[in-house]
């Protein structure tokens, strides 16, 4: 998966 930074810079989501 690729780690993408969402609106909150401290939150990472695997897309």
Swiss-Prot record:
It comes from Pseudotsuga menziesii. This is Isoflavone reductase homolog 1. Coiled coil: none annotated. Its EC number is 1.3.1.-. It comes from the Eukaryota. Belongs to the NmrA-type oxidoreductase family. Isoflavone reductase subfamily. It is an enzyme of class 1 (oxidoreductase). Keywords: Cytoplasm, NADP, Oxidoreductase. The keyword Heme does not apply. The lineage of its organism: Eukaryota, Viridiplantae, Streptophyta, Embryophyta, Tracheophyta. The keyword Transmembrane does not apply. GO terms for cellular component: cytoplasm. One of its GO terms (molecular function) is oxidoreductase activity. It is found in: Cytoplasm.
């Amino acid at each position: 998966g690729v780690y993408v930074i969402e609106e909150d810079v401290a939150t990472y989501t695997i897309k």
